[in-house]
């Protein structure tokens, strides 16, 4: 179970909605994932950064590798309660759960 550090912007915010993951965020996340369905870290690892989704699907089939579908709309810069960052469509990237919980989490702990 994750704990919230004293003084954190999340202290006392027990629901996901109170932490900024409300209807506005859900709409932004859904639109982003529809337009950008692939994990950006997986694309980086496969050498396919910037490729259109259709080309990624075809190339993965040709290479015989799993399509790098992402399910998480992740804030590039942690919003820490800042609504401008939280709802900025340019501050969202698609990640798969392993990259979100692994590499991204490790990078954020360093901040």
Describe each PLM feature range.
Residues 26-36, 85-88:
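Short, flexible, mixed-charge glycine/proline-rich loop motifs
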Residues 37, 101-104:
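Generic structural signal for secondary-structure transition and capping sites
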Residues 1, 40, 93, 97:
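Cys/His/Pro-rich metal-binding microdomains
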Residues 75, 99-100:
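Histidine-centered divalent metal-coordination motifs
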Residues 82-99:
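Short beta-strand-alpha-helix junction that forms the catalytic/metal-binding core
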Residues 1-31, 43-69, 81, 105, ...:
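A boundary/linker detector
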Residues 39-41, 72-80:
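Histidine-centered catalytic micro-motifs used for acid/base chemistry in nuclease
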């Amino acid at each position: 179970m994750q704990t919230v550090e004293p003084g954190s912007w999340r202290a006392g915010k027990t629901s996901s909605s109170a932490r900024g993951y409300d209807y506005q965020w859900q709409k932004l996340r859904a639109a982003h994932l529809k337009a950008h369905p692939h994990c950006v870290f997986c694309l980086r690892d496969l050498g396919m950064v910037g490729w259109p989704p259709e080309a990624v699907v075809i190339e993965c089939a040709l290479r015989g590798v799993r399509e790098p579908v992402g399910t998480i709309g992740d804030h590039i810069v942690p919003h820490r309660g800042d609504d401008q960052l939280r709802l900025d469509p340019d501050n969202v990237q698609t990640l798969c759960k392993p990259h979100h919980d692994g590499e991204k989490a490790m990078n954020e702990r360093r901040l």
